[in-house]
Amino acid sequence: MSQTIYFGTYTKKESKGIYKAQFDPETGTLSQLELVAAEPNPTYIAFSEKGNLYSVGAEEGKGGIASFTADFQPLNHVVEEGAPLCYVSVDDKRQLVYGANYHKGQVLVYQLEADGRLSFVDQDTHQGSGP
């Protein structure tokens, strides 16, 4: 029995964003590839319990998080200057979305609004270096 999977991509060449496909675990094949959301370099994605989609996103050369409805309509982008985020996670219990920016050493926190949009809440920046 096939499973529906979603995945983000790098979009420098032919790819256009976030895709859906059918995965057959018996054969290891993908079929019925479909673009569900156009977004620059959505390399990490996460879904909320309501089905809203959150992805690493970009807008006008800035990096951040993009939000989409359960049927993949764009809601909003929350972005800032500099390198794009590389990780996004949804905390449905606390109604928060977390993003990580390895280049800046940051963890960013966003509030999940009732309609699925995001608003920036806080950030923590790591100071220092490795061992």
Task: Spell out what each predicted region is.
Residues 72-131:
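Asp-box/WD-like beta-propeller blade repeats and closely related beta-sheet repeat scaffolds
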Residues 1-13, 17-22:
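An edge-strand/N-cap motif at the start of beta-rich repeat modules
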Residues 14, 40-43, 84-86:
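Beta-rich catalytic cores
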Residues 7-11, 55-59, 99-103:
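Conserved beta-strand positions in repeat-built beta-propeller and related beta-rich domains
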Residues 37-38, 80:
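WD40 beta-propeller blade-start loop/N-cap
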Residues 14-19, 62-66, 106-110:
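Structural motif
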Residues 1, 47-50, 90-94:
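Residue-level detector of Asp-centered blade-edge/turn motifs that repeat once per structural unit
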Residues 25-35, 71-77, 118:
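Blade-edge beta-strand/turn elements of extracellular beta-propeller
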